[in-house]
Amino acid sequence: AWGFILSAGQALGQAEGYKSLPLNAEFVSPPDSGEPKDRRAESARRQRYSERLRLVNDIYKGSASFEDNQAAFDQWYNEVVFAQMSQDSDAMLEAMATNREAMFKQLGNASNAQAVNHLVANLAFNKFQEIVTDNYPPASRLNAVVILGRLDQTIAKPRNVAPAPLAKALPVLLQYVQDGALPEYVRVGALWGIERHCRIDGQKQNTQIAAQQRSQVIAALLPLLGPKPDDRTQPVDYWMNRMATRSLGA
């Protein structure tokens, strides 16, 4: 489904010369220039990468202090993880889904709530909004809006803790759906996130989505159940209609 939607979005005629977040060359090799690489430098780079990843995992486990290492933690995500997801090289595009799922796996295994909350509510929430709304590669923008829809303020734990989606992400996703200037693949990705918010909320005994916000969801999604606009492709219209229907029925 995402392939159809992304292809339709790229056909909208976005300009070339996409933005990308700067990669930290201390941890990640710069884009391939075609010149032979220095093996010793590459080995040192891989060593630094492994050491920083180990530190981040130790922070999540609580065996390293988040307060003492926040600068290193922030640098890892802003200059490595998020930056990798903003590149348009073939290698980075192929690794994008793997990198995304690795990030969510880290969150699922983490026990340090302070570090998790900082990543979700501050770093990821802010940086992926930037990627969604600016001239980043289409795959990066779609990936970013999907991540925004998956951010949780309470991380699910098997058999005993249900997920609670990040509440402040829902108004942002609604704004994307209603913004006709955004590529339609972004709007479909936002609808997927809205459906997730509504579905999880519908499974709870006590709803977390306020009545006023539910009214905003209805107002944003009902128009999508109407006839297909002339400038919208059939696959995109199908997924918009489907996600809107599932959200309203949750």
Please place each PLM-identified region on the residue numbering.
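Bacterial N-terminal signal peptides
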Residues: 1-7
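Extended repeat-based scaffolds of very large eukaryotic assembly and lipid-transport proteins
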Residues: 14-243
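Long alpha-helical repeat scaffolds
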Residues: 249-250
